[in-house]
Regions:
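Catalytic cores of transferase enzymes with a strong primary signal for eukaryotic protein kinases
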Residues: 9, 49, 95
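Generic structural signal for secondary-structure transition and capping sites
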Residues: 19, 26, 41, 45-49
Length: 99
């Protein structure tokens, strides 16, 4: 099993989404976290399974929520770079992803 690491920016993305969903409806943030965890588990099981979006960065979309988990990986480690809302402009995140 590979290790998984999150950049500080990815952790901020997650925190911001959780706070936003909790403001929308009590308990919705919990649903988001469960779907996020399921997506991360799927990446851990088979990181090769998901679409290569740009360069060496892959994306796994989160079920029920309009977010994608952007990550890279090697033999030992998965690095989550970002958890972006799918409507965000590529101009906003291309710098963070090194594009």
């Amino acid at each position: 099993m590979r290790d998984i690491q999150f950049t500080k920016e990815a952790l901020f993305d997650i925190e911001a989404a959780v706070l936003w969903y909790e403001e929308q409806r009590t308990g919705l943030s919990y649903d988001f976290e469960l779907c996020l965890e399921a997506g991360i588990d799927a990446i851990l099981r088979n990181p090769e399974a998901f679409q290569k979006k740009y360069k060496d960065i892959k994306i796994r979309f989160i079920s029920r929520f309009p977010y994608g988990i952007h990550y890279t990986y090697n033999d030992n480690t998965i690095i989550v770079i970002a958890v972006f809302h799918t409507s965000r402009s590529p101009k906003n995140w291309s710098k963070r992803l090194g594009l």
